[in-house]
């Protein structure tokens, strides 16, 4: 007979009394040895006590796997004290990864069949916590019987167990569908809450269930209206709101049932208006109900006045002292800004005020919403606010703010001068945080505004003289001084105060940039080229410029050294050609939002005139290997002859006149996958400098109610093509249209072979693993021809 070891309370006191971690380990190891000995000797009297101590040790992070089989023995015992500890141990020590969890299936089945409510409750709790798919299939009939038991205690647990079963095995939806209609007539709030949760899960999993439960929308409306008009109840009211948990759950279900369904939406419109106007907002419980009401109004086909009411509620949330509520309001308004832009615009001053929040998450959300609210009518006022925020915002927000200002200015700039001033302000304030293409965009903008050349070069010269630490600003200034240095010296700009600059000051400033330790190699390249161009624009002697160029002929940076050697050679051997070579750069067409719209229109016009069908390949069997699927030889495909899209194209070629070809039209996007709210879209870009290269951006979005996790997208192409997969932007797609995942595919197709893609998607959705393998044969012809 094993001498009984410590009681659980004594063990806890001894562990807490340990002075060091070594003493704690010593106590636990000693007690675990006693527990092992007791298990080996099969002591039935103290088994539940030993397992309880082992569970406490497990909670402290120490190994307790040797107690798994003891859980099975205690569950099979007829004593309630043993079963209670046994089921608790099973929930803590067992899961689907251990085969031992299947051994308790028969014990759970027997306990569910008994009429003892506490035992049935223990079995249901365990099944809903760690029940695997196999266990759910075996025990579904027993749980279905318990759904209509007279005891509310058992029915509540059976309903929640059914929710777990549907998440594990969606095909069990048909088993639990019939009892739900009867359960909706219950007056017990706990049963109603569980039933609404079960119906919500059924509707998310099964389109048939969604159609079935749209018939009960009037009943749900009646239940919610009763809750709203009900007086104070000590049993259910929280902060003066009648059962806010049940109200929130009903609103979520109504949102699912009313989405894209006109009749259901009309049925619940009046109720939603009643909830939105009668709910008390002085406490957090009322705010929770109001927020869920707003989400429901946003998702269903609600009336226009109701949507304005929802936006106004979110506007009141912005004035709340609770930061969590303000964050929720900003996030929701950001979702609404595309569909209800004018209604959200009314709260623009409050949103801008949120930029000054000390909380980083709040100011980030306010920044995103402020940028989304910019349009052609308020761009000047919004840019002033955003530029003021840029000067004082935290460093982690400065890059996003600068990029957003540049994009908004490019899209809504009222004048070119205002556009240039805005970009210069961003470069001066946060030059090191701007996007890489900001320098190229500004140089193209200045080059295309001939009337602003003198103004731009003087503004940039002044900014460069004050600060040479902002590298993008220095690069643009050096480029502009090199191109338009003659205008800087002429002093004939009427738009700003007169500025007297001589040649020596300009050269000294560029030399300062070259010698600065803060200058990047690319910046020195800009400055060296600017000096070289000034040799044809200045009237003085070029010896100083030649000396600087010759110095960098021995620079350690290879690119800078090569450039200096070439410039020196230009001075020595080709001086007669130097003026022609260093002429001002011609105008460069800018790629922006307006150019994209024009290209889209020309693309649509071209599609109307082209009627050639795109050949498709039959879908291959999914049983073969992913790469071998695409190894088959593709048939010869005949394409219509390419027609010159330019007007009078044949005449131009006949006369041998110079002709600038139009920019290529954008390739249309393609949706290739959609399942339960998860969508996969492909967008295509073919760089003009490398037509054989195709860049495909995979965008995964999620409009369902559950997050998509562990998302992986793999692809394969025929062996005649080369595929390179870039790393995705993440592996989780948030629910309800959250931030999508993007991934870049680089495909090299030098032979212009017909393009086919084989995609394999794996992800977890609603606690279920999903794997899809499919072939994409309808890729646009423009992506490979």
Curated annotation (Swiss-Prot):
<dbReference type="GO" id="GO:0045202">
    <property type="term" value="C:synapse"/>
</dbReference>
<keyword id="KW-0968">Cytoplasmic vesicle</keyword>
<dbReference type="GO" id="GO:0030133">
    <property type="term" value="C:transport vesicle"/>
</dbReference>
<dbReference type="GO" id="GO:0005794">
    <property type="term" value="C:Golgi apparatus"/>
</dbReference>
<comment type="function">
    <text>May function in protein sorting in late endosomes or multivesucular bodies (MVBs).</text>
</comment>
<dbReference type="InterPro" id="IPR050840">
    <property type="entry name" value="Adaptor_Complx_Large_Subunit"/>
</dbReference>
<dbReference type="GO" id="GO:0030121">
    <property type="term" value="C:AP-1 adaptor complex"/>
</dbReference>
<dbReference type="InterPro" id="IPR013041">
    <property type="entry name" value="Clathrin_app_Ig-like_sf"/>
</dbReference>
<dbReference type="GO" id="GO:0016192">
    <property type="term" value="P:vesicle-mediated transport"/>
</dbReference>
<protein>
    <recommendedName>
        <fullName>AP-1 complex subunit gamma-like 2</fullName>
    </recommendedName>
</protein>
<dbReference type="GO" id="GO:0006896">
    <property type="term" value="P:Golgi to vacuole transport"/>
</dbReference>
<feature type="domain" description="GAE">
    <location>
        <begin position="665"/>
        <end position="780"/>
    </location>
</feature>
<dbReference type="GO" id="GO:0000139">
    <property type="term" value="C:Golgi membrane"/>
</dbReference>
<dbReference type="GO" id="GO:0010008">
    <property type="term" value="C:endosome membrane"/>
</dbReference>
<dbReference type="InterPro" id="IPR011989">
    <property type="entry name" value="ARM-like"/>
</dbReference>
<dbReference type="GO" id="GO:0035615">
    <property type="term" value="F:clathrin adaptor activity"/>
</dbReference>
<dbReference type="GO" id="GO:0006886">
    <property type="term" value="P:intracellular protein transport"/>
</dbReference>
<dbReference type="Pfam" id="PF02883">
    <property type="entry name" value="Alpha_adaptinC2"/>
</dbReference>
<dbReference type="InterPro" id="IPR016024">
    <property type="entry name" value="ARM-type_fold"/>
</dbReference>
<comment type="subunit">
    <text>May interact with AP1S1/Sigma1A-adaptin and AP1S2/Sigma1B-adaptin. Probably does not interact with APB1. Interacts (via GAE domain) with RABEP1, NECAP1, CLINT1 and AFTPH/aftiphilin.</text>
</comment>
<keyword id="KW-0653">Protein transport</keyword>
<dbReference type="InterPro" id="IPR017107">
    <property type="entry name" value="AP1_complex_gsu"/>
</dbReference>
<dbReference type="GO" id="GO:0005798">
    <property type="term" value="C:Golgi-associated vesicle"/>
</dbReference>
<feature type="region of interest" description="Disordered">
    <location>
        <begin position="592"/>
        <end position="617"/>
    </location>
</feature>
<keyword id="KW-0472">Membrane</keyword>
<dbReference type="InterPro" id="IPR002553">
    <property type="entry name" value="Clathrin/coatomer_adapt-like_N"/>
</dbReference>
<comment type="subunit">
    <text>(Microbial infection) Interacts with HBV major surface antigen L. Interacts with HBV core protein C in a ubiquitin-dependent manner.</text>
</comment>
<keyword id="KW-0813">Transport</keyword>
<keyword id="KW-0333">Golgi apparatus</keyword>
<dbReference type="InterPro" id="IPR008153">
    <property type="entry name" value="GAE_dom"/>
</dbReference>
<dbReference type="GO" id="GO:0016020">
    <property type="term" value="C:membrane"/>
</dbReference>
<comment type="similarity">
    <text>Belongs to the adaptor complexes large subunit family.</text>
</comment>
<comment type="function">
    <text>(Microbial infection) Involved in MVB-assisted maturation of hepatitis B virus (HBV).</text>
</comment>
<keyword id="KW-0967">Endosome</keyword>
<dbReference type="Pfam" id="PF01602">
    <property type="entry name" value="Adaptin_N"/>
</dbReference>
<keyword id="KW-0945">Host-virus interaction</keyword>
<feature type="region of interest" description="Essential for ubiquitin-binding">
    <location>
        <begin position="369"/>
        <end position="379"/>
    </location>
</feature>
<dbReference type="InterPro" id="IPR008152">
    <property type="entry name" value="Clathrin_a/b/g-adaptin_app_Ig"/>
</dbReference>
């Amino acid at each position: 007979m094993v001498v009984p070891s410590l009681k659980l309370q004594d063990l806890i006191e001894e562990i807490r009394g340990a002075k060091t971690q070594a003493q704690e380990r010593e106590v636990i190891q000693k007690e675990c040895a006693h527990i092992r000995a007791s298990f080996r000797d099969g002591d039935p009297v103290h088994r539940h006590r030993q397992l309880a101590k082992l569970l406490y040790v497990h909670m402290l992070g120490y190994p307790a796997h040797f107690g798994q089989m003891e859980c099975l023995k205690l569950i099979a015992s007829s004593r309630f004290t043993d079963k209670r500890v046994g089921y608790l141990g099973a929930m803590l020590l067992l899961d689907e990864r251990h085969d031992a969890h299947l051994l308790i299936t028969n014990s759970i089945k027997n306990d569910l069949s008994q009429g003892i409510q506490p035992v049935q409750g223990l079995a249901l709790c365990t099944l809903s916590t760690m029940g695997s798919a196999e266990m759910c299939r075996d025990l579904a009939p027993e749980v279905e019987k318990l759904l209509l038991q007279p005891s509310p205690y058992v029915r509540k647990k059976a309903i929640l167990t059914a929710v777990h079963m549907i998440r594990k095995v969606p095909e069990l939806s048909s088993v639990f569908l019939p009892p739900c209609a009867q359960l909706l007539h219950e007056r017990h709030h706990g049963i109603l809450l569980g039933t609404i949760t079960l119906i919500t899960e059924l509707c998310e999993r099964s389109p048939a269930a969604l159609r079935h439960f749209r018939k009960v929308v009037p009943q749900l409306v009646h239940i919610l209206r009763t809750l709203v008009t009900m007086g104070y109840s000590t049993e259910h009211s929280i902060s003066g709101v009648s059962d806010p948990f049940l109200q929130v759950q009903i609103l979520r279900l109504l949102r699912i049932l009313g989405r894209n369904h006109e009749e259901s939406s009309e049925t619940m419109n009046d109720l939603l208006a009643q909830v939105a106007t009668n709910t008390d907002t002085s406490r957090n419980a009322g705010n929770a109900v109001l927020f869920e009401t707003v989400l429901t109004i946003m998702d269903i086909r609600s009336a226009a006045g109701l949507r304005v009411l929802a936006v106004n509620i979110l506007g009141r949330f912005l004035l709340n002292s609770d930061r969590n509520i303000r964050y929720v309001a900003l996030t929701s308004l950001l979702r609404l800004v595309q569909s209800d832009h004018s209604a959200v615009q009314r709260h623009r001053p409050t949103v801008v005020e949120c930029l000054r929040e000390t909380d980083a998450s709040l100011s980030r959300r306010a920044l995103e919403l402020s940028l989304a609210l910019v349009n052609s009518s308020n761009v000047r006022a919004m840019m002033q606010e955003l530029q003021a925020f840029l000067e004082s915002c935290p460093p982690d927000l400065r890059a996003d703010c600068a990029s957003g200002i540049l994009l908004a200015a490019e899209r809504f700039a009222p004048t070119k001068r205002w556009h240039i001033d805005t970009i210069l302000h961003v470069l001066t304030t946060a030059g090191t945080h701007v996007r890489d293409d900001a320098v190229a965009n500004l140089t193209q903008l200045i080059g295309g505004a001939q009337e602003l050349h003198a103004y731009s070069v003087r503004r940039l010269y002044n900014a460069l003289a004050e600060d040479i630490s902002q590298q993008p600003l220095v690069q643009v200034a050096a480029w502009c001084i090199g191109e338009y240095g003659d205008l800087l010296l002429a002093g004939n700009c009427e738009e700003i105060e007169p500025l007297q600059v001589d040649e020596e000051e300009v050269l000294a400033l560029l030399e300062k940039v070259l010698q600065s330790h803060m200058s990047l190699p690319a910046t020195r390249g800009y400055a060296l080229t600017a000096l070289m161009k000034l040799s044809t624009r200045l009237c003085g002697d070029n010896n100083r410029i030649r000396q600087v160029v010759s110095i960098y002929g021995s620079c350690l940076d290879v690119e800078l050294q090569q450039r200096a050697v070439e410039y020196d050679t230009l001075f020595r051997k080709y001086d007669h050609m130097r003026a022609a070579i260093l002429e001002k750069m011609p105008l460069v067409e800018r790629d922006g939002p307006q150019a994209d719209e024009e290209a889209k229109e020309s693309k649509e016009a071209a599609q109307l005139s082209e009627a050639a069908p795109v050949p498709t390949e039959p879908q291959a069997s999914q049983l073969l290997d992913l790469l071998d699927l695409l190894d088959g030889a593709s048939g010869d495909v005949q394409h219509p002859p390419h027609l010159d899209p330019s007007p009078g194209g044949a005449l131009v070629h006949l006369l041998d006149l110079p002709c600038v070809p139009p920019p290529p039209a954008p390739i249309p996007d393609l949706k290739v996958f959609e399942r339960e709210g998860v969508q996969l879209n492909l967008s295509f870009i073919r760089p003009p400098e490398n037509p054989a290269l195709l860049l495909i951006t995979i965008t995964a979005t999620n409009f369902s109610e559950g997050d998509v996790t562990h998302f992986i997208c793999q692809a394969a192409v025929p062996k005649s093509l080369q595929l390179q997969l870039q790393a995705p932007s993440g592996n989780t797609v948030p629910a309800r249209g959250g931030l999508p995942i993007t991934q870049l595919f680089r495909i090299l197709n030098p032979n212009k072979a017909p393009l086919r893609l084989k995609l394999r998607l794996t992800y977890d959705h609603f606690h279920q693993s999903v794997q899809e393998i499919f072939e994409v044969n309808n890729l646009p012809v423009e992506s490979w021809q």
